[in-house]
Amino acid sequence: MNTPTLLVTKRDGRQEPIDLEKIHRVITWAAQDLNVSVSQVELKARIQFYDGIRTADIHSTLIKAAADLISLEFPDYQYLAARLAIFHLRKIAFGQYEPPHLFNHVTRLTEQGKYDAHLLRDYTADEFEQLNQALVHERDLCFAYAAVKQLEGKYLVQDRVTKKVFESPQFLYMLVAMCLFAHYPAATRLSYVLRFYHAVSTFKISLPTPIMSGVRTPSRQFSSCVLIECGDSLDSINATASAIVKYVSQRAGIGINAGRIRAIGSPIRNGEAQHTGCIPFYKHFQTAVKCCSQGGVRGGAATVFYPLWHLEVESLLVLKNNRGVEENRVRHMDYGVQLNKTMYQRLIQNQDITLFSPHDVPDLYEAFFADQARFEQLYAQYEADPSIRKKAIPALELFGLMMQERANTGRIYIQNVDHCNTHSPFN
C-alpha cells in the first residue's frame, strides 16, 4: 500500500498517521474462509476516509463498505460485515477485541448499574469460573450482518441515549440463562444454565425481545407478555391503564381482556348517566400503550380482546381500518375477537347471532369462558327475554365483516375460548 498521508484521531484525542496495513489485517482476518474481495472493501472504504477521521468512524466505514457489497451473487459479504461489526462492538464494550472474564464483566457492569445485582449474589465465584470456561465467544462470528444490527439495536445492554453497547452476544445468552435458572437447586442448576446457553447461542431456540433485552438488568423483567383483566368500573379501567404504562415501560407486550366494558347507551347509576361505550376507553388504553416505549427497545404494543356477541361488535371490528375518522377509529392497537362453538353453530346453520351488552348479562359473560353448556342455556334464555337490550344480526353477515377486516388489516386475531380452555396447561 502507498505511504499514508491522512491523520487519524485516536480515542484519547491524539492524532497519528493512518495505518492502512492495520486496516488490511483486520479486513483479511474478517474475510477468512469467505468468498469476498478484501481489496474491493478497502477501495470502497478508502474513498470515504478524510483527514482527522476518528478510529471509530474508520470501523463504521469499513462495516458499511462491506455491507454495501452484499448481493445475491456475493452473499458472503453479509458475514464479512457482521465480523467487522462484532470487532467494532467489542472494542466499544470492552476497549479490546478479547472479551473479559465473565465474573469481571458482571462485576463491572453491576457496579455501573447495568446488570442485576442478584447475579453476583446468586452465583459463587467457582460457578462463574465454570460458566466462563463454557462460553464460546467464537459463535459471535456466526451471525449475519442483519442479525448483528438487530442485536446491537434491540437486545444488547446499552445506554439507550448515547447508544454505547456494554456487552457482546455470548454474554447476553449466558446471563439470560443464569437469571432464568438462578433459583433452581444448586446441585443441578449449572447443567440447566449450560444446556440453555448452548441451545440459544447455536440458534436451536429463540427468545422473545423482553427476555433478551431485559432479564439480566435491574428492571428484572421476566415476562415477555402481560395479560390484564379489565372490569366495567372506572376504577378498574383506570387501573388497567396504569398497569399498561407500568408494564410497557418494563418491556412487556400487553394483552387486555376488555370484554366486560358495557356497550354505548347503557345506563350508569340507574340511568343518572349514559355510557359512552367501549371506543373512548380503548382510546384511553391506546394512549397508555404509546406513552412509553418498551424499555427503549421498541414502541409499546397491545392486543385488546372482546367477545363476538358484544353489542358494539360492529363498531369494534372496524377500529383498525383506514376508513372513518379519528373519533371512531383506534388504529394503533391490535384486536382479538373471542368465539365459541355456539357462534360457529349459528354460522353453519345460517342463523342469527344475538348481541348483548355484557353488563346486562354478567352470568352469560362468565359462562362464556367457564362453562359452555351453561353459556348455551343462558344465551337462548336471554334471547327470549324481552326486558334485555339486544340486537340480532345474521351470523353470515357478522362473520363476513370480521373476516373482511381481518383480511384488510391483518391484525385481527381469533380466540376460540372453549378450545383454549380445553387445550391449555392452565386451570
Q: Language-model segments: which ranges?
A:
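Extended catalytic cores of very large enzyme megasubunits
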Residues: 1-427
